[in-house]
Structure formats: structure tokens, C-alpha cells
Amino acid sequence: MAPKVAEKKPSLAGKAPAGKAPAEKKEAGKKTTTATGEKKKRTKARKETYSSYIYKVLKQTHPDTGISTRAMSIMNSFVNDIFERVATEASKLATYTKKSTITSREIQTAVRLILPGELAKHATGDGTRAVAKYSTFDN
């Protein structure tokens, strides 16, 4: 018996469905145009950092001292790490007490659990003072 010849079906790859025009692809990095036809640049995604706050604290404590970009990056990572640890611990504490809201009490307890000894005492004292100052502020 002779082998059967396979029939080739017409390929639909690369063809748009009937009645629809092919969609235009936007290339990355290209400028887009507004309704009036003028070109506008894409804005970069903003990265939030604690750099300005770290710099302000540095100038309060050591007015004549500067900080390098690399050191600022390390300090920013440090603040993010501590923030993440405190937030996670406070979330666990709220879950244990079956509450859906993290209050200053959970934050204070989380700080006491995470930070060692004297550092925890100073942090809770400064935090309590900051909350009191915020509470007395009038709009």
C-alpha cells in the first residue's frame, strides 16, 4: 500500500480574524502622542524612599556631616527592613487578639518585641511623644 499524502490546511498564523484590523503594537520607550498630535514623554515610575527624612535627622544631629549615595541607600534599606518587621509583628498581634485594626498599642508592643533592651525603651518613649504631639495638633 502506498502511504497517504497529508493534506495541508491553510495556515492562519499571522492573519487577523475576518472583519478586524490587526492591532497596532506600541514599542517600549517610544514617545506617545496626545490628541493634538504633540509628543509627550512617559514619566518614570516614582520610587519612594526615606532619603529626605534621613537627611533631615542627620542635619539635626550632626549639622556639618554629609552622607554618600551608597550610605543613604543602606540607611533606606535599613528603615524599610525595620518598618517591615514592625508591621508584620503588629499584624500578628492584631490577629492574635482577633482585631482587624492595628493601633498604636500593637505598634508599641511590636517595637518592644523586635528591638533589644534600651533601644526599645527609647523608641517607645519617642513614639509615645510623637503620637501625643500629633493628637494635640489642630487643623
From Swiss-Prot:
The modification N6-acetyllysine is found at K8, K9, K15, K25. It holds the Pfam family Histone. GO terms for molecular function: DNA binding; protein heterodimerization activity; structural constituent of chromatin. CDD domains: HFD_H2B (cd22910). There is a cross-link at K133 (Glycyl lysine isopeptide (Lys-Gly) (interchain with G-Cter in ubiquitin)). Its main location: nucleus. Residues 1-47 are annotated as: Disordered. Keywords: Acetylation, Chromosome, DNA-binding, Isopeptide bond, Nucleosome core, Nucleus, Ubl conjugation. It comes from the Eukaryota. Residues 1-10 have a biased composition (Basic and acidic residues). Monoubiquitinated by the UBC2-BRE1 complex to form H2BK123ub1. H2BK123ub1 gives a specific tag for epigenetic transcriptional activation and is also prerequisite for H3K4me and H3K79me formation. H2BK123ub1 also modulates the formation of double-strand breaks during meiosis and is a prerequisite for DNA-damage checkpoint activation. Acetylated by GCN5 to form H2BK11ac and H2BK16ac. H2BK16ac can also be formed by ESA1. Acetylation of N-terminal lysines and particularly formation of H2BK11acK16ac has a positive effect on transcription. GO terms for cellular component: nucleosome; nucleus; site of double-strand break. It is found in: Nucleus; Chromosome. There is a cross-link at K8, K9, K25, K26 (Glycyl lysine isopeptide (Lys-Gly) (interchain with G-Cter in SUMO)). SMART domains: H2B (SM00427). Core component of nucleosome. Nucleosomes wrap and compact DNA into chromatin, limiting DNA accessibility to the cellular machineries which require DNA as a template. Histones thereby play a central role in transcription regulation, DNA repair, DNA replication and chromosomal stability. DNA accessibility is regulated via a complex set of post-translational modifications of histones, also called histone code, and nucleosome remodeling. Belongs to the histone H2B family. The nucleosome is a histone octamer containing two molecules each of H2A, H2B, H3 and H4 assembled in one H3-H4 heterotetramer and two H2A-H2B heterodimers. The octamer wraps approximately 147 bp of DNA. This is Histone H2B. It comes from Yarrowia lipolytica (strain CLIB 122 / E 150) (Yeast).
